[in-house]
Amino acid sequence: MCGIIGYTGKLAAAPVLIEGLKRLEYRGYDSAGLAVVADEHMYQVKSVGKVAQLEAVAGQQPELKKLAGCGIAHTRWATHGAPSTLNAHPHLDESGRFAVVHNGIIENYQELRKHLEGKGVHFRSQTDSEVIPHLIAGAYEGDLLSAVAAALKQLDGTYGIAVISSLEPGVVVTARKGSPIVIGLGEGENLVASDIAALLPYTRQVIYLNDGDIAAITADKVDLRNIQNVPVEREVAKIDWDAGQAEKGNYPHFMLKEIFEQPETIENAIRGRIDHEMGTAILNGMNLSPRELALINRIVIAGCGSSMHAGMLGEYYFEDIAGISTSVEQAAEFRYRNPIIEPNTLVIPISQSGETARSEERRVGK
């Protein structure tokens, strides 16, 4: 669900990263951020909302447009922790020398967090991802690749990550387990991304990482290993797609892509929202109290297109599991009606982008 882009080379890193994030916007997200290492200094910018907002915030630091070096950036879809600047990636260790962007779910993050807090580490966010930079900082002994490998061995779950450090300017370390990562090979520059679409303006030569692969990339070199630190070779593939085709992957059109991605989409939606130890759901951003939820006796869902179809699935679950009468409305028609909304009715407008006009207009009462 989230997007990752990393760059090391001759260009100013921040503009490359922001352009890469724009090419990943179709994946959906609620916040964004970037970190750049230049002159052995770590620069970081994060914001809630669209990449355009991140670009505006970054514009308040004019030096970012000029700093050549390496950097990483990320668009986040909240799982652990609500959408906020603190919870947005990249996450840094306490010293501010290691920055990490992460896709996936760290299933044992609570155990790792308690262990780190017991050693005096202070956390800034509510996310599972923040344990990673702290683990890397604790394992660092002069080689970033080795420190990242040591940290990853402690993780249970899935990850696609990119890491930079002010201690090793020009180096981006990346790794994958269950979350896609692809390296783009340029001339005097190299990139890493979660999706080929972010790489196409700069290169058509790519290396797909396998699960368990870890790589350190510089502007002119890729050091690729497995998690046991054994050097490995991967085929260099040539991409002849355009940007539109890249977004569709290997599918002829988006409809087929969305159909076959449904199992993965459902899994991603559930990840991080179930506390198996407590047997409860984690609903970050839900502002209704348990008392208010108990008073709900009817649910109305409004959406357009695929959002409406998601609502239709929700209708079955609400009625089957919660025993609450539920109806689904076409948002384009709902806004022009004067629907009967009784007391204790929960209305849920759905929009994949958060900007669907019909859902938004009904939400604000137009």
Question: What is the predicted role of each segment?
Answer:
Residues 1-248, 252, 261, 267-300, ...:
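Conserved short alpha-helical segments that host acidic/polar catalytic motifs at enzyme active sites
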Residues 253, 257, 307:
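Internal active-site segments that recognize and position negatively charged phosphoryl groups
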Residues 294-366:
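Glycine-rich phosphate-binding loops that contact phosphosugars or nucleotide phosphates
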